[in-house]
């Protein structure tokens, strides 16, 4: 090979390396999903979302109205609108449902019977609400680290989820602040459901 040809070859290789390193452009944007997060006061909604956002637990204050957090994951960003769970707030939840693409429902698995009954009623209402009934649901049985915590199977039976949510996209998972791997895995499953719903909408 002549010196000229060798020089051209080296220059072309340099060009390819330059393109690979410097000119490949920004990575594709992660999809964003708008979610609503509901549950009774004390269920742990704020603490779970703050932990996922790597916020200091010292700054966690129970939500009285609503707050919005952008929760980042490797393959998506979840814009979560958390609604306060007090008695006088829950009757206004439905005003904030519009535009939601998925639902996170947090319950205290170690709560009193009265609070568990109230949580069941609220979840039943959400699963049947016209603006939410077709959306993916992530149901988190929180506070599994407490001695009085009920198992997922007990929650599923008590909440009558099998007959009520038949045909819907839903996940019921145990969680606690002490097990972040399990919590992140639960949200990864929710993201999979959101992506599946997106793909179905495109095919239609």
From Swiss-Prot:
Sites where the protein binds GTP: 39-46, 82-86, 142-145
Any Pfam family: Arf
Coiled coil (UniProt feature): none
Superkingdom of the organism of origin: Eukaryota
Regions crossing the membrane: none
Gene Ontology MF annotations: GTP binding; GTPase activity
CDD domains per the UniProt record, alphabetical: Arl9_Arfrp2_like
Entry keyword set: GTP-binding, Nucleotide-binding
Family: Belongs to the small GTPase superfamily. Arf family.
Record-linked PANTHER family: ADP-RIBOSYLATION FACTOR-LIKE PROTEIN 15
Full protein name: ADP-ribosylation factor-like protein 15
Organism: Pongo abelii
Lineage: Eukaryota, Metazoa, Chordata, Craniata, Vertebrata
């Amino acid at each position: 090979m002549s010196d000229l040809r060798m020089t051209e070859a080296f220059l072309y290789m340099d060009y390819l390396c330059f393109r690979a390193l410097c000119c490949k452009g920004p990575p594709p944007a992660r999809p964003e999903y708008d979610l609503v997060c509901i549950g009774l006061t004390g269920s742990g909604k704020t603490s779970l979302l703050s932990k996922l956002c790597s916020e200091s637990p010292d700054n966690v204050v129970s939500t009285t109205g609503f707050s919005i957090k952008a929760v980042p994951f490797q393959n998506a960003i979840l814009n979560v609108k958390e609604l306060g769970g007090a008695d006088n707030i829950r009757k206004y939840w439905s005003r904030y449902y519009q535009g939601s693409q998925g639902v996170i429902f947090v319950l205290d698995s170690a709560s009193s019977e009265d609070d568990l009954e109230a949580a069941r009623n609220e979840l039943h209402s959400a699963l049947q609400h016209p603006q939410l009934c077709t959306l993916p649901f992530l149901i988190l049985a929180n506070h599994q680290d407490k001695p009085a915590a009920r198992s997922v199977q007990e929650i599923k039976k008590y909440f009558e989820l099998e007959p009520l949510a038949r045909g819907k996209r839903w996940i019921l998972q145990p969680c606690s602040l002490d097990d972040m791997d399990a919590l992140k895995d639960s949200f990864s499953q929710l993201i999979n459901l959101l992506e599946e719903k997106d793909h179905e909408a495109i095919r239609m």
